Design a protein with these regions (language model features):
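STAS-like cytosolic regulatory interaction modules
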Residues: 1-55, 72-114
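Histidine-anchored nucleotide/phosphate-binding helix
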Residues: 67-71
Length: 114
């Protein structure tokens, strides 16, 4: 599936959903992807939504807003959001924003953090 320069693949996993985001997560892309993913969440009601960020090369404050919006939606529906495999630049953005204190972040190549 495709936003402007942000693409994503969806994988259903026994009541969970993993979405692999690819490209850039900025204002223009977050708007398009947001509606599609929210519809998927409402339709499927996953226990866990895992956003794989390993292929995101750029993220700005709109990307953080996108993540926090999905966090709030999953909390509202009784589910959990997990961010997977962010690169070092994205981790730095999360640290500066304090996001890792709120949303679970896991890296399959390193230790899991929360």
């Amino acid at each position: 599936m495709k936003g402007k320069t942000c693409f994503y693949d969806v994988e259903a996993l026994d009541g969970d959903i993993r979405i692999c985001l690819k490209g850039e997560m900025d204002h223009h892309n977050a708007v398009g992807v947001r509606g599609e993913i929210d519809k998927l969440i409402y339709d499927e009601r996953p226990k866990r939504l895992m956003l794989d960020l390993s292929e995101i090369g750029f993220m700005d404050s709109s990307g953080l807003g996108f993540i926090m919006g999905r966090y709030a939606l999953m909390e509202k529906l009784g589910g959990t959001l997990i961010l997977e495999n962010p690169n070092e630049r994205i981790v730095k953005i999360f640290e500066l924003a304090g996001l890792q204190r709120i949303v679970r972040v896991e890296n399959s190549k390193k230790e899991k953090t929360k």
